[in-house]
Swiss-Prot record:
It comes from the Eukaryota. Residues 154-193, 294-314 are annotated as: Disordered. This is E3 ubiquitin-protein ligase KCMF1. It catalyses: S-ubiquitinyl-[E2 ubiquitin-conjugating enzyme]-L-cysteine + [acceptor protein]-L-lysine = [E2 ubiquitin-conjugating enzyme]-L-cysteine + N(6)-ubiquitinyl-[acceptor protein]-L-lysine. Residues 297-314 have a biased composition (Basic and acidic residues). GO terms for cellular component: cytoplasm; cytosol; extracellular region; ficolin-1-rich granule lumen; late endosome; lysosome; plasma membrane; synapse. Pathway: Protein modification; protein ubiquitination. Spleen, small intestine, ovary, peripheral blood, lung, kidney and pancreas. Expressed at low levels in the thymus, prostate, testis, colon, heart, brain, placenta and liver.
């Protein structure tokens, strides 16, 4: 295993990269490759001051630590997630955290869980000292039953770290009366190492498979519940979306109705105003054209009607002419009589006797006789 399978660099986004892997113990699920770590890659949540745990592949671990002898008391190196100091074993890391960071309650990621095969690489805890005491106790404090647990936590070459941990050559497995496995220390020898490598690797693989299966079983329950929750959320979101769509449709229909009603009212108002304007304009045109070409609209008359109309017009014109002439003649005669009377007055003023015409004299006589006959007789004396 020369690659970090299933891991990608969060800076350059390279997946299944080779070489060293640096995992941040403060940021959740943040990994860097060697080049990005050495170049000082940072983000808004990750800085260069964050403690990083180095994880090696199997090839790099054999290259760096091949041929070295380590006992069970000297596992691989870990980094303190609080102060960033490196080179701790499980025992020394627990002692360091208990003595130096007992009162610290910051949420950090366990470096041991991140390095174990099948462990949770993003296990966050706010009581790191209690987590180390419960989950990562030293091998000398373990009994036979916990020895099996320690074998399950044995180093896997594909996820090793920069420091040494219990080597496979130092682990001897013998069958006990109860059928369990027990570990004992022995002196280092290449022949023993080569002989025990396949068995240790097989056991480590079996432990990793068991742990992964247990993790899958443990995660199957919450995954099913999470799926149910997601389905419920999707149903609720769909219901909300349908309600929102219905509200939008009703609002659109209402706006359309109001628009159509307003359009109809405006149309009726415009038609009424246009009709009123047309009637007013027609009346104005009729008033203006009362004496202009009115006869064009008259119906056509027959020949007899036309002759009768012309004769009536001729009679009217003659009557008007005679009336005008008579008025003019009367004015002239009256003016001439006045002139004659004035002359007679002037003649009488000169002492001359007025000569009465004959007819006038006769009329005066007749009037006098008639008056005498009509007078009543005088009363008797």
């Amino acid at each position: 295993m020369s690659r970090h399978e299933g891991v990608s660099c969060d800076a350059c986004l390279k997946g299944n990269f080779r070489g060293r892997r640096y995992k941040c113990l403060i940021c959740y699920d943040y990994d860097l490759c060697a080049s990005c770590y050495e170049s000082g890659a940072t983000t808004t949540r990750h800085t260069t001051d964050h403690p990083m745990q180095c994880i090696l592949t199997r090839v790099d671990f054999d290259l760096y630590y091949g041929g070295e002898a380590f006992s069970v008391e000297q596992p691989q190196s870990f980094t303190c997630p609080y102060c960033g100091k490196m080179g701790y074993t499980e025992t020394s890391l627990q002692e360091h955290v208990t003595s130096e960071h007992a009162e610290t309650s910051t949420e950090v990621i366990c470096p041991i869980c991140a390095a174990l095969p099948g462990g949770d690489p993003n296990h966050v805890t706010d009581d790191f000292a209690a987590h180390l005491t419960l989950e990562h106790r030293a091998p000398r404090d373990l009994d036979e039953s916990s020895g099996v647990r320690h074998v399950r936590r044995m180093f896997h070459p594909g996820r090793g770290l920069g420091g040494p941990r219990a080597r496979r050559s130092n682990m001897h497995f013998t069958s006990s009366s109860t059928g369990g496995l027990s570990s004992s220390q022995s002196s280092y020898s290449p022949s023993n190492r080569e002989a025990m490598d396949p068995i240790a690797e097989l056991l480590s693989q079996l432990s990793g498979v068991r742990r992964s299966a247990g993790g899958q079983l443990n995660s199957s329950g919450p995954s099913a519940s999470q799926l149910q929750q997601l389905q419920m959320q999707l149903q609720l979101e769909r219901q909300h979306a349908q309600a929102a769509r219905q509200q939008l449709e009703t609002a659109r229909n209402a706006t359309r109705r109001t628009n159509t009603s307003s359009v109809t009212t405006t149309i009726t108002q415009s038609t009424a105003t246009t009709n009123i304007a047309n009637t007013e304009s027609s009346q104005q045109t009729l008033q203006n054209s009362q004496f202009l070409l009115t006869r064009l609209n008259d119906p056509k008359m027959s020949e007899t009607e036309r002759q009768s109309m012309e004769s009536e017009r001729a009679d009217r014109s003659l009557f008007v002419q005679e009336l005008l002439l008579s008025t003019l003649v009367r004015e002239e005669s009256s003016s001439s009589d006045e002139d004659d009377r004035g002359e007679m007055a002037d003649f009488g003023a000169m002492g001359c006797v007025d000569i009465m015409p004959l007819d006038v004299a006769l009329e005066n006589l007749n009037l006098k006789e008639s008056n005498k006959g009509n007078e009543p007789p005088p009363p008797p004396l």
